[in-house]
């Protein structure tokens, strides 16, 4: 336990918060072939592999994911939300931050209804997150 005098001389430092999705905070200058500090809310990428993964211990399912090479040349695993999808290799997708708690190594989500990703068919509630248009009736 430090004394008051020690704290006056050298105050406590607050910890710097690390990003939950660090790959979105890096750009790539292809002309200079170097990374830049470029924060972005989403990034475009190309699917290199689409598959399923089993979740951690108490849960059981086949969760859909895609391995995506982003525009800054970094590869990440991204979760495909919703029921059914049209993604395959070489599909162009939009990736946002947000981890999936029971899938190890998946820290990103694919945005449904953007670029090559279709929205979820037959979805009536919570359509905004799944890229579904308003039904005509």
From Swiss-Prot:
CDD domains on file: Ribosomal_S12 (cd03368)
Role played: With S4 and S5 plays an important role in translational accuracy.
Region called Disordered, residue ranges: 1-57, 118-137
HAMAP family recorded: Ribosomal_uS12_B (MF_00403_B)
UniProt xrefs under InterPro entries: NA-bd_OB-fold, Ribosomal_uS12, Ribosomal_uS12_bac
GO BP terms in the entry: translation
PANTHER family given in the database record: 30S RIBOSOMAL PROTEIN S12 FAMILY MEMBER (PTHR11652)
Pfam families membership: Ribosom_S12_S23
Protein keywords: Methylation, Ribonucleoprotein, Ribosomal protein, RNA-binding, rRNA-binding, tRNA-binding
In-chain residues carrying the UniProt-annotated modification 3-methylthioaspartic acid: 102
GO CC annotations, alphabetized: small ribosomal subunit
Molecular function via GO: rRNA binding; structural constituent of ribosome; tRNA binding
The name this protein goes by in its record: Small ribosomal subunit protein uS12
